[in-house]
Amino acid sequence: MTQIVFIHGPGAGGCADSYINQLYHYPNSLAPNLPGHLDGAPCSSVERYTEWLRGWLHARGHHQDLVLSGFTLGACVALQYALDYPDEVKALALMTIAMRPKQRRPQDLRFRLEAGDNPETYEKWLGMMDGIMHFIEPDLRARLLQRHREVGPVAQHADLVVIDRFDVRDRIHTLKAPLLLIQGVDDPLATGDYEEEIHRAVPGSKLIKMKDAGHFPMVERPDKFNAALDEFLSEID
């Protein structure tokens, strides 16, 4: 039986709350909070997050027919999982992901660390998080901003460092699971067409460029995202 698992990233609240619309649309789906996101200590690499997720799923009896969907860090974890354990993964639906280190300005990382120490910088960071989520409906946006307050900028810094170390260019050709890529074309944080690179590297993959969506398509345009995932699931069943 197919088990859908949604994996969050450091943005859109930095926790599983960003998948509230999908958890409603797919009643038996799962969306764990990764370590260090509200509780515990963050992991130091995508590989460690992947092993944590696998243990979390196996403890609940989910070890095959997994449909893994994630954005940013969560997308990296999903892709790593599918490469490491291909017999357990049925399909992937990924957003805002690169198969190689992203080009990020050093000051963008320092900004998160400074926000953890300086109240004025912290407020600027919160304002930035609020601005990035401008496509999200107001009530949910406020809820996710509160989650950002709880998770904090230092945890986000750690996640960005982990993302920027992720590199599977030498393994991407071994991917067996059907792959759906969804890219928000109005992403204010985009520094390259990374999804297109993966699409070209994985024969048979599907790339959707979603209008009026930015960094978090699943929460910015939930109806469009859910429809795209529904169609993808119907194609692989």
Task: Name the predicted role of every residue range.
Residues 41, 210-226:
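Catalytic histidine-centered segment of alpha/beta-hydrolase-like enzymes
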Residues 70-74, 78:
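Gly/Ala-rich beta-loop-alpha elbow adjacent to hydrolase catalytic centers
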Residues 188-194:
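Conserved alpha/beta-hydrolase "acid-adjacent" motif
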Residues 48-65:
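Conserved acidic catalytic loop of the alpha/beta-hydrolase fold
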